[in-house]
């Protein structure tokens, strides 16, 4: 499976992942809203939104 693998401040990149899932998580801090994408479906801290999917 190919997932996007980057933070919102970086150029988009992709990565081949063996986990079978991708994630997109977002949170806000002093820099604004940060979006991060990657492989698998990690646990997140309270206040972090996450979406896990088979292709995102």
Curated annotation (Swiss-Prot):
Tissues of expression: Expressed by the venom gland.
Secreted in keyword set: yes
Keyword field: Acetylcholine receptor inhibiting toxin, Disulfide bond, Ion channel impairing toxin, Neurotoxin, Postsynaptic neurotoxin, Secreted, Toxin
Main localization category: secreted
SUPFAM superfamilies for this protein: Snake toxin-like
Subcellular locations according to the entry: Secreted
Domain of life: Eukaryota
Cellular component terms (Gene Ontology): extracellular region
UniProt-recorded Gene Ontology molecular function terms: acetylcholine receptor inhibitor activity; ion channel regulator activity; toxin activity
Disulfide linkage: 3-22, 17-39, 41-52, 53-56
A Pfam family reported for this protein in Swiss-Prot or TrEMBL: Toxin_cobra-type
Family to which the UniProt record says this protein belongs: Belongs to the three-finger toxin family. Short-chain subfamily. Type I alpha-neurotoxin sub-subfamily.
Free-text function comment from the UniProt entry: Binds to muscle nicotinic acetylcholine receptor (nAChR) and inhibit acetylcholine from binding to the receptor, thereby impairing neuromuscular transmission.
Entry protein name: Frontoxin I
Organism from which the protein derives: Micrurus frontalis (Coral snake)
Taxonomic path: Eukaryota, Metazoa, Chordata, Craniata, Vertebrata
């Amino acid at each position: 499976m190919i997932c996007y693998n980057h933070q919102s401040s970086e150029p988009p990149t992709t990565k081949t992942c063996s986990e079978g899932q991708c994630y997109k998580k977002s949170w806000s801090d002093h820099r604004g809203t940060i979006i991060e994408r990657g492989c698998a479906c990690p646990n997140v801290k309270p206040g972090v939104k996450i979406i896990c999917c088979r292709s995102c």
